[in-house]
Structures are given as C-alpha cells and as structure tokens.
C-alpha cells in the first residue's frame, strides 16, 4: 500500500513536466562553447551549461526564459549557474 502511494505521488509530480526537460544535461560531442540552459530535475531549476555545438539532446535551451517556459519553472526559482 505504501509503495502504491509513493508511486502515485512521484508520477503526479512528473506528469506536468515536458519529457524533454527530464533528459540529463548533454554537452554534446563537439568542442564549441555555446552558453545554454537545461532543466535540472534534481534542483528543479533551469541551469546554465556550455554546449559543444552538436548532438546533445532536447534538454537544451538558448535562453533561461525559454527553459523556464517549456519546463514550467517560475523565474524566482532560477537561475543557478554552474
């Protein structure tokens, strides 16, 4: 019973978040240096990282505002710089 309760609580919290936002940060394989933002599901914030310029994944946003909008983060919860 406790397991089911925990499962539904976790599922409910993750339900409203865009799936792309749950992907891990991925700097990509190239060696460029593009400042970008990603959603950190542990801190529940959009955080800055340096993108290499190719590959990577969809958890990669040009601006803090874009990351917050897509991932449903309130501005006062961000930013956290790496």
From Swiss-Prot:
Assigned keywords, A-Z: Disulfide bond, Ion channel impairing toxin, Nematocyst, Potassium channel impairing toxin, Protease inhibitor, Secreted, Serine protease inhibitor, Signal, Toxin, Voltage-gated potassium channel impairing toxin
GO CC annotations on file: extracellular space; nematocyst
BPTI/Kunitz inhibitor domain span: 21-71
Signal peptide bounds: 1-16
Localization per Swiss-Prot or TrEMBL: Secreted; Nematocyst
Molecular function via GO: potassium channel regulator activity; serine-type endopeptidase inhibitor activity; toxin activity
Domain of life: Eukaryota
Principal location: secreted
Pro-peptide region(s): 75-82
Cystines in this chain: 21-71, 30-54, 46-67
Site (Reactive bond for trypsin): 31-32
Family the entry assigns: Belongs to the venom Kunitz-type family. Sea anemone type 2 potassium channel toxin subfamily.
UniProt miscellaneous comment: The primary structure of the mature peptide is identical to that of kappaPI-actitoxin-Avd3b (AsKC1) from Anemonia sulcata (AC Q9TWG0).
Its biological purpose: Dual-function toxin that inhibits both the serine protease trypsin (Kd=30 nM) and voltage-gated potassium channels Kv1.2/KCNA2 (IC(50)=2800 nM).
Name under which the protein is recorded: U-actitoxin-Avd3f
Lineage: Eukaryota, Metazoa, Cnidaria, Anthozoa, Hexacorallia
